[in-house]
Every structure is written in structure tokens, then in C-alpha cells.
A protein has these predicted regions:
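Short hydrophobic/aromatic-rich beta-strand segments that constitute the beta-sheet cores
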Residues: 54, 71, 105-107
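Short, conserved beta-strand element in jelly-roll/cupin
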Residues: 47, 56-71
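Short, exposed beta-strand-loop hairpins at the edges of beta-sheets
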Residues: 95-99
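Short acidic-glycine-tyrosine-enriched beta hairpin
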Residues: 75-92
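A short, N-terminal "cap"/entry segment at the start of jelly-roll beta-barrel domains
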Residues: 1-39
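A short hydrophobic beta-strand segment most commonly corresponding to one strand
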Residues: 88, 101-111
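Conserved short histidine dyad/triad with adjacent acidic residue
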Residues: 35-56, 90-91
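Localized chelating/binding microdomains
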Residues: 31-32, 64, 93
């Protein structure tokens, strides 16, 4: 197997409103370099400020490149993050994102 390069300067698709917003205006998301890999999928994700429910049911690892915000798991305390931080979400983690400053992250979703 050979390495897969995922370029940071990949072109992003058009922004779309999140489907489960909990604030107005709805946050906008867009992705770049989405690729299938042997364990799932990977790419870049960007989101404007706002609150919304997490919609990914698979396990996910996220490394934040820029921005800041928090994630509050259902029944838990907020987890604040900023550029340079990383979060691992176990499968079926549910909760609410609160994006304070536009966030860009690299992610791996495990199937």
C-alpha cells in the first residue's frame, strides 16, 4: 500500500447550511479533498460560526487547523477546542457543536 497525500490547498466545494441547526443564522459547512481510504474516509471540513447537532454516527478523529469552538456531548460538559487541538469521537457520539470562529479541520471517519 502506498501513502495518500491530502493537500491542504485543495479546493473546497460550495458552502451549504447544516441540516440540524440550533441557532440562527444556520452555520455553513463545506468540504475539500474528500477521499475514501481503507478504514473509512478523510478530508478537510470547514464551518462558519453557529450551533448545530453532530450528525456523524461513525467514529471520527478531528485535528483542528484553524478556528475555535466547543462540542458538548449529550449529558456531558462542553469540550473547548482551538487550532492545534484534536478530538476523537467514539461511534454514536451525539451532542452539539458551537463554532465561535470559523473552523477548519482535517478528519478521518472510521467505517
Amino acid at each position: 500500500m502506498s501513502p495518500t497525500l491530502i493537500r491542504a490547498d485543495s479546493a473546497f466545494g460550495p458552502p451549504v447550511a447544516v441540516s440540524m441547526p440550533t441557532s440562527e443564522p444556520a452555520a455553513l459547512v463545506r468540504t475539500a479533498a474528500d477521499q475514501d481510504i481503507p478504514v473509512g474516509s478523510t478530508g478537510f471540513w470547514e464551518c462558519t460560526p453557529g450551533r448545530f447537532r453532530r450528525q456523524v454516527h461513525q467514529a471520527e478523529y478531528s485535528c483542528f487547523i484553524s478556528g475555535e469552538g466547543s462540542f458538548t456531548p449529550d449529558g456531558g460538559e462542553p469540550i473547548a477546542f482551538r487550532a492545534g487541538d484534536a478530538i476523537y469521537f467514539a461511534a454514536n457520539t451525539e451532542g452539539e457543536w458551537n463554532i465561535v470562529e470559523t473552523v477548519r479541520k482535517a478528519y478521518v471517519i472510521f467505517e
